[in-house]
Amino acid sequence: MDIVNDLVSSISSISSEAAEEEAIRDELRNDKGGLIAGIFVLTLTASFVPWFLTKAKITNLVSVVSILTCLSAGVIIGAGFNHILPDAAEEFQSYVEAVAPDNKYGDFPFAHTITIVTMFALICVDKILVSGGLDGEADHNHMDLSQHNHPSPHAAGEIDLNIYTNGDDDDDDVNEDQEEDSTKDDEKEHGHGHGHGHGHNSSNSSSNGHGHGLKKKKKSKKEHGHGHNHDHSSNGHSHKDEKDSEKVNVSSKSKAWVFLVALSLHSIFDGLGLGSETQKDSFYGLLIAVLAHKFLDGLVLGIAIKYAYFSFKFSCIALVFAAAMTPLGIGIGMAISSAYESSTDAYLVKGIILSITCGSFIYISLIELLPSGLCQKGWPKLKLAVAFLGYSVMAILALWV
């Protein structure tokens, strides 16, 4: 009789555990469905922020984005090493125990190896894309916003992304005033103004005779000599300026393309990890990391696309495409997880997907986000502090999530 009771109790326990796991899967399935729409809207909205702020006079956008970028990098590093990588290693361990518990290679760090291989693969793809020549440049930084610090002069009223050049015009005005005062002093000292002969000008370039001199920089307000000093710079350099402007525009378009491809690839890996995750705590830990940088991803991509001066129609198509990549990855991950749900191969599949996701996290945080945030001028100590803060928060959350 006791044996029968124990058997019934065991069956009931197994049934209750199965029912609980099924309830968790249903809950996560519903959350993932809502997440598909939520992440798409979040990323797309962030991508169009530069257009929303076109008429606003914002002078510190680069500094704000760079600080948030460092914070996001810290969060992603913490999520990768404290959440995703341990879960991936656990999945591989479960697979080995279920299939070949006595295998002598069971303790091999499969998760860590796949993670590092993925990181190097992404670096190789990145460098091959650029060095192969979309614009023929040897080096770049996808998220370096300094290239967008000087928007087109035709875009009047648009955002000034460089807070470190605001004082340049004032300095030029001061220099002009100083040059004008110096010119007046010279006039008084030498006792002649607009006569023939050897004259003086405030830009340290002398003109003989009638003073037909060429100037590389802008003319001083007052000049000595005969007064016939001609400035040929506007005509002589107009074609060169047009070529330089065209070259910069092509470079901006190429970098925007590269960033679009790289970000889309990384977004698919984000979605794969979220879609394949079946553990509630691990899912929400990964979700925090993904949401921490999705807004920034969209914002920086929007800046890159906007200041590459594509047509608005093409920009919309590109941004919608990029925003759809994480939801696409979630859907693929859910399909893979469902296909292997009742098989021991599910451990292997989830372990591989999580390891790839972790590798992409390390790449995007240490290769792209953190260097990009630190390369912008200003607040280096604050940026390092917020990066460590982001990591610390995710490390502490690993105690419960």
UniProtKB/Swiss-Prot annotation:
The chain crosses the membrane at residues 33-53, 61-81, 114-134, 256-276, 285-305, 316-336, 351-371, 381-401. It is a multi-pass membrane protein. Residues 167-184 have a biased composition (Acidic residues). One of its GO terms (molecular function) is zinc ion transmembrane transporter activity. It comes from the Eukaryota. Residues 212-225 have a biased composition (Basic residues). Keywords: Ion transport, Membrane, Metal-binding, Transmembrane, Transmembrane helix, Transport. Residues 141-247 are annotated as: Disordered. Pfam families: Zip (PF02535). InterPro entries: ZIP. The keyword Transport applies. Residues 200-209 have a biased composition (Low complexity). Residues 226-247 have a biased composition (Basic and acidic residues). Signal peptide: none annotated. It is found in: Membrane. One of its GO terms (biological process) is zinc ion transmembrane transport. One of its GO terms (cellular component) is plasma membrane. Belongs to the ZIP transporter (TC 2.A.5) family. May transport divalent cations. May participate, with dstA, in the regulation of the differentiation of stalk cells during development. This is Protein zntC.
